Amino acid sequence: MKVAANTSKMLVEKLDLLKGGRRRRRRSRRRRRSRRRRSRSPYRRRYRRRRRRRRSRRRRRYRRRRSYSRRRYRRRR
């Protein structure tokens, strides 16, 4: 039932957008974003950011260190 209600609301909003209802569009989007942020995103965003940052930093550091070490050893030898 929830899914059907959401789809009907989406269709109504799209019709309003085509007709030129700007005020309704902004209010509805803000309410939906706030609800989603409170329920889903805070945990997911923190988890994803930590994972991505750690992986990217570690990979970059190791790649740079390996490249520098290889170049130095080759030059010294």
From Swiss-Prot:
Keyword match DNA-binding: yes
Identification of the protein by name: Spermatid-specific protein T2
Post-translational changes noted in the entry: Phosphorylation occurs at different degrees. The triphosphorylated form may be predominant in T2. SP2 appears to be phosphorylated in elongated spermatids, but dephosphorylated in mature sperm cells.
Subcellular location as annotated: Nucleus; Chromosome
Organs and tissues of expression: Testis.
Keyword terms of this UniProt record: Chromosome, Developmental protein, Differentiation, DNA condensation, DNA-binding, Nucleosome core, Nucleus, Phosphoprotein, Spermatogenesis
GO terms for biological process, alphabetical: cell differentiation; chromosome condensation; spermatogenesis
Compositionally biased residues, Basic residues: 20-77
Keyword Protein transport: no
Any one Gene Ontology molecular-function term assigned to this protein's record: DNA binding
Lineage, top ranks: Eukaryota, Metazoa, Spiralia, Lophotrochozoa, Mollusca
UniProt function note: Cuttlefish spermiogenesis is characterized by a double nuclear protein transition: histones -> spermatid-specific proteins (T1/T2) -> protamines (SP1/SP2). The protamines compact sperm DNA into a highly condensed, stable and inactive complex.
Location, primary (coarse class): nucleus
Region (Hydrophobic): 1-21
Region called Disordered, residue ranges: 1-77
Gene Ontology, cellular component aspect: nucleosome; nucleus
